[in-house]
From Swiss-Prot:
Pathway: Carbohydrate degradation; pentose phosphate pathway; D-glyceraldehyde 3-phosphate and beta-D-fructose 6-phosphate from D-ribose 5-phosphate and D-xylulose 5-phosphate (non-oxidative stage): step 2/3. The active site is at K143. One of its GO terms (molecular function) is transaldolase activity. It is found in: Cytoplasm. It comes from the Bacteria. The keyword Hydrolase does not apply. The lineage of its organism: Bacteria, Bacillati, Actinomycetota, Actinomycetes, Mycobacteriales. It catalyses: D-sedoheptulose 7-phosphate + D-glyceraldehyde 3-phosphate = D-erythrose 4-phosphate + beta-D-fructose 6-phosphate. Belongs to the transaldolase family. Type 2 subfamily. Transaldolase is important for the balance of metabolites in the pentose-phosphate pathway. This is Transaldolase. The keyword Glycosyltransferase does not apply. Pfam families: TAL_FSA. It is an enzyme of class 2 (transferase). It comes from Mycobacterium ulcerans (strain Agy99).
Amino acid sequence: MASQKPNLAALSAAGVSVWLDDLSRDRLRSGNLQELIDTKSVVGVTTNPSIFQKALSEGHDYDAQVAELAERGADVDATIRTVTTDDVRNACDVLAPRWEASGGVDGRVSIEVDPRLAHETDKTIQQAVELWKIVDRPNLLIKIPATKAGLPAIAAVLAEGISVNVTLIFSVDRHRGVMDAYLTGMEKAAQAGHDLSKIHSVASFFVSRVDTEIDNRLEQIGSAEALALRGQAGVANARLAYAAYQEVFEGDARYQALKERGARVQRPLWASTGVKNPDYSDTLYVTELVAPHTVNTMPEKTLDAVADHGVVKGDSITGTSGDAQQVFDKLEAIGIDLSDVFDVLESEGVEKFEASWKELLDATQAQLDALAK
């Protein structure tokens, strides 16, 4: 049996679930996903519109299926839904042994609702239920963005007994709203008679994009004090989010009542962990965010960097919230408007996924049109 890379094994031992932020048919067919499970501690997969747009635009892995769907008269939305849910279902099957071995904590695969629905509560709920039924695997997570319209959708979908990955969380305030939606949804699920131990949720907190936006603003200020704060906000923000998670899931009476009925914690998931600034360590958003009951979803480049030279020294979050708050106090003192930062990041996050989805729609439509000639 293949052995796990020591640095990634150390990360797992410290309580961090290693998930891969990528999926493609080639990765499934070639056995590469299984290889990453066997050698790089991967116990889950996340997808998003950008990942599927890239997968479908490269190579010819989807051509035969798209041609078959075209022959059947499928429109572009149905075509994309079929090919993406097929990949996700197959990934769920590859990860099923990890799901079983972890008692349902890991072995999870995420698929996102159409990003064009990010500000429409009812349509998000409807599509989440549809995707859950189409994929039809217990280790699926439905990704719903943490927009204001997304929060009630999250609660409603959980109430149906459906597992949810809440995505596009940038601020601790919004993270608190997400945890509240989780508790509300689980309370309703309990009232409806669902087995709470079967419902899983993670809260995907984006890291590197926070640094990118705040670093740009610090460079515009340009003072020595401002420049000295570059590269600190992303990690500090995530550490404050973990402290908020501990408040709710280690002491809140609402959660304790649900826990007695089998509910699990809603784990923080560190997303956007690929380092975008070449001046920073390429493992920064992994080694600095180690704590029990967390998930880190990584692009393969980051996964490889951690395997090669990531130094994992155990828990690097617990007890750091005071220092993290100081970073934020300094940012505000020199004129960084944090609420504006988070508003910009959320709207940009939705726009990026919408743009990827449009590219995917346009490319698939062109393929369908060519086949119709």
